Curated annotation (Swiss-Prot):
It comes from Pongo abelii (Sumatran orangutan). Residues 549-619 form the SH3 domain. This is Metastasis-associated in colon cancer protein 1. One of its GO terms (cellular component) is cytoplasm. The gene is MACC1. InterPro entries: DEATH_SH3BP4 (IPR056183), SH3_domain (IPR001452), SH3BP4_C (IPR056181), UPA_SH3BP4 (IPR056182), ZU5_dom (IPR000906). Interacts with FASLG. Its main location: cytoplasm. Acts as a transcription activator for MET and as a key regulator of HGF-MET signaling. The lineage of its organism: Eukaryota, Metazoa, Chordata, Craniata, Vertebrata.
Length: 854
């Protein structure tokens, strides 16, 4: 079986060269495992000239860019090609069909104006001035217009052998539309041009793409065609076409459903799907399989009054008719397509036969999913826009073109955003929603007037796709880094519907400077690249092994000797004197009940003692101590022991420490890498302090991995940071690890915890699980920690920097569960001891009163 696959980004099929495909990394869509896939520039090429294509394909691939001298053939901005388009009309016959070897023919260089957009002469563009926009920065479109104007003087050159597809009838007389189509197909990224050259805000340096279309060429043995990043698949059975013939299948999904299908008795629950076929001489039907965004209610009345239907039309706007050959199981529908046509439009809708009180709309009979997609730029910048997209089905494309972006109060050309994350939730009925976004990182903020957006009930009833924009900006001149922000969806009464967190991509990488810039431009480059703020200088205090000075003590009123030892709990005899680290108390479960405990030290061991079992006395009242010496080193060694058993995300740890530690040498010395010198960073070209810190951390990780039976990465790193007095950073790392480990330990029990913490409804819980469901429609047991982590991360974000309350409330909620995991997993109790000991450790171990709060 042979399936020839291709991707294009406009239904008109604009020609694409191999070099153009290197501008943006594209992921191939998923196909059946049995498919044999080969790339093809145009299906007609294989259909009409299979031998020629095979013969010359290998030779062409030997050249890095075989079209280097002829790429102007697909460039609609050169006047000679524009003139060729107007003068040589060939009744929609592609030149490729007349001369399929045209792509592989070597030609002379001729004039440089026949070059690719990759070869734009930047200096020539810089010398060009626009009378309309002198002194102002130029957009990519304007730069390309300059090239177009320059080419006008050379319209007599290369007046033959130009490659231009004439099957774009609808674009012939609309140059702007053709330009947009060409940019879309070619995936021209603004970031491909030097940002300092075009002086544009880097926040808008995004690839220009249109909706993704998936097309495959399938032979008589059949196969499957799946729309990328979706649950939409067309299955082509064996024998669908005769032996020797091929079927071309093209899929395209539109987020906006037909508005006439959304009213009180009907609502769409899938995107509008366009299926294009190249061969109608068929012998077998096609099978469409897709997931839908709703299920009929389980009650008998809903089952009788409501049905899910697949609607078919030959036009995008209808009229639609119901297809009878449908099968629905839970949230998946299968449709047998018998009456085939060259272009078909299909959409799934829930329809009610009638409404009976108290039902007001079709929504009362179904459980409808509403999805939110978070879109943003490929890289973040000091100021960037996040687009929140809301729709009534579960399809969210990987890239989305937004045409109503405004900058400085003016509309700019369409911008393509990348999908950062998505979330689905269930709504009982269409109603107004309030969506707010807030940053979880103090280095970034959301513009005040854009923190909260409203979605109207009418928009949900009409099935509209709603786009809301949120502007993020870097606070002052702080260092750029990825960060997390939270999205909250609420009802008008303030009841939360969905809460989730999104992690941004990395900041934009530094673009390579042009090596051949003139001297005056190089000087300007140096000025522009000057740092925004001076290097942060922090003098870290030295950790001192000093004896702890306790001010509070407790005399035990009874003996406690446990048959089954419990980690982090003290055992004592009646009359023992225990040194207390303070008057603060922690609430944790003991043998069977939740009690209040002091953190104390007895016989050289730190642990918990029940408050009711001791009588607190002052230092002057102490008559006898079993051990009078307990140093800061003893304290540090014991309080960090639970970190050996905590789970962590290495990338998060690496990012946080690299950003918040400002002296790599101090960190290296504390970790035992005092032999490292500046010369060690030359081979990795680490210039920034954060890069050097990152190198030290990676070295620690490698060493701990080599001796993983005796060394623990997180444990050793936290010990080093505490010796540097980086307590705020330590608290952040501990909270991250505790939340993640709790999620892993909880597994499917997270639902019970969510109900106890914030009283989540069943629908809200399902909203956390939907993104992690597998092919069976359920979350696998081994993957259940993911929705648990999503929930706990969102919940903990509301505490801000108050790490003690987060850990205490988490411990209390876990203890209240029917079968508490904390009865046998005590590491969270150990973490509570740690955070309640930090203040005593700091006061005693560091002679300076200066706080290094990072």
């Amino acid at each position: 079986m042979l399936i020839t696959e291709r991707k294009y980004f406009w239904s008109g099929r604009i020609a694409q060269s191999r070099s153009e495909a290197n501008l943006v990394d594209m992921e191939a869509g998923k196909l059946s495992k049995s498919c044999n896939i080969t790339e093809c520039q145009d299906p007609d090429l294989l259909h009409n000239w299979p031998d020629a294509f095979t013969l010359h394909g290998n030779n062409a691939s030997k050249v890095t860019n075989p079209f280097w001298n002829q790429l102007s053939a697909s460039n609609p901005f050169l006047d000679d090609i524009t003139q060729l388009r107007n003068n040589r009309k060939r009744n929609n016959i592609s030149i490729l069909k007349e001369d399929p070897l045209l792509f592989f023919r070597e030609i002379e260089n001729g004039n440089s104006f026949d070059s690719s957009g990759d070869e734009l002469d930047v200096h020539q563009l810089l010398r060009q001035s626009s009378s309309r926009k002198s002194g102002r920065s130029k957009s990519v479109s304007e730069l390309l217009d300059i090239l177009d104007d320059t080419a006008h003087a050379h319209q007599s050159i290369h007046n033959s052998d130009q490659i231009l597809l004439h099957d774009l009838e609808w674009l012939k007389n609309d140059r702007e539309a053709y330009k947009m189509a060409w940019l879309s197909q070619r995936q021209l990224a603004r970031s491909c041009l030097d940002l300092n050259t075009i002086s544009q805000s880097p926040g808008w340096a995004q690839t220009q793409l249109a909706e993704v279309t998936k097309a495959c060429k399938v032979n008589h043995q059949g196969g499957s065609v799946q729309l990328p990043e979706s649950d939409i698949t067309v299955h082509v059975p064996q024998g669908h076409v005769a032996v020797g013939e091929f079927q071309e299948v093209s899929l395209r999904a539109f987020l906006d459903p037909p508005h006439m299908l959304n009213h009180d008795l009907s609502c769409t629950v899938s995107p509008l799907l366009e299926i294009m076929l190249g061969n109608l001489n068929t012998m077998e039907a096609l099978l469409l399989e897709m997931k839908i965004g709703a299920e009929v209610g389980k009650d008998p009345f809903s089952q009788v009054m409501t049905e899910m239907v697949c609607l078919h039309s030959l036009g995008k706007e209808g009229p639609f008719k119901i297809l009878s050959n449908c099968y629905i199981y839970k949230d998946t529908i299968q449709v047998k397509l018998i009456d085939l046509s060259q272009v078909m439009y299909l959409v799934v809708a829930a329809q009610a036969k009638a409404l009976q009180s108290p039902a007001a709309t079709i929504w009362d009979y179904i459980h409808k999913t509403t999805s939110i997609g978070i879109y943003g730029p490929k890289y973040i910048h000091p100021s960037f826009t996040v687009v929140l997209t809301v729709c009534g089905h579960n399809y969210m494309p990987g890239q989305l073109t937004i045409s109503d972006i405004k900058k400085c109060g003016k509309n700019i050309s369409p911008v393509v955003f990348q999908l950062w994350g998505k979330q689905s939730f269930l709504l009982d009925k269409p109603q107004d929603l309030s969506i707010s976004i807030f940053s979880c990182d103090p280095d970034f903020e959301v513009k005040t007037e854009g923190e909260r957006k409203e979605i109207k009930q009418k928009q949900l009833e009409a099935g509209e796709v709603v786009h809301q924009q949120f502007l993020f900006s870097l606070v002052e001149h702080r260092e750029m880094h990825l960060f997390d922000f939270c999205v909250q969806v609420e009802l008008p009464n303030g009841e939360p519907v969905a809460q989730f967190c999104i992690t941004t991509p990395d900041p934009t990488p530094n673009l390579k400077r042009l090596s051949n810039l003139p001297g005056y431009l190089q000087k300007k480059e140096e000025i522009k690249s000057a740092p925004l703020s001076p290097k942060i200088l922090v003098k870290y205090p030295t950790f001192q092994d000093k004896t702890l000075n306790f001010t509070n003590y407790g005399v035990t009123l009874k003996a406690v000797l446990r048959q089954s030892k419990i980690d982090y709990f003290l055992e004592y005899f009646k009359g023992d004197t225990i040194a207390l680290l303070g008057e603060g108390k922690v609430k944790v479960i003991g043998q069977s009940k939740v009690k209040e405990w002091y953190v104390g030290v007895l016989r050289g061991k730190i642990g918990l003692v029940h408050c009711k079992n001791v009588k607190v006395i002052s230092k002057e009242q102490v008559m006898f101590m079993s051990d009078s010496v307990f140093t800061t080193r003893n304290l540090l060694e014991q309080i960090v022991l639970p970190l050996k058993k905590l789970t962590y995300i290495y990338s998060v740890v690496l990012t946080l420490v690299s950003e918040k530690v400002y002296d790599w040498k101090v960190l290296a010395d504390v970790l035992g890498y005092s032999h490292l010198s500046v010369e060690d960073f030359d081979q990795i070209h680490a210039d920034k302090e954060s890069e050097k810190v990152s190198y030290v951390i990676k070295k620690l990780k490698e060493d701990c991995h080599t001796k993983r039976n005796t060394r623990k990465f997180l444990y050793e790193l936290i010990v080093a940071l505490l010796k540097m007095d980086c307590q705020a950073l330590v608290a952040r790392l501990i909270r991250e690890a505790a939340v993640l480990t709790s999620a892993v330990k909880l597994g499917k029990g997270w639902r019970e915890l969510a109900e106890k913490l914030v009283r989540l409804t069943k629908q809200q819980m399902e909203a956390y699980e939907i993104p992690h469901r597998g092919n069976t429609g359920d979350v696998a047991v081994e993957m259940m920690w993911k929705p648990a982590y999503d929930f706990l991360y969102t919940w903990s974000a509301h505490y801000g920097n108050n790490y003690r309350d987060v850990l205490q409330d988490l411990q209390s909620a876990l203890d209240r569960m029917k079968n508490p995991v904390t009865k046998h997993w005590r590491e969270l109790t150990g973490v509570l001891i740690l955070v309640n000991s930090l203040e005593v450790l700091r006061v005693t171990a560091f002679s300076t009163s200066e706080e290094v709060w990072k």
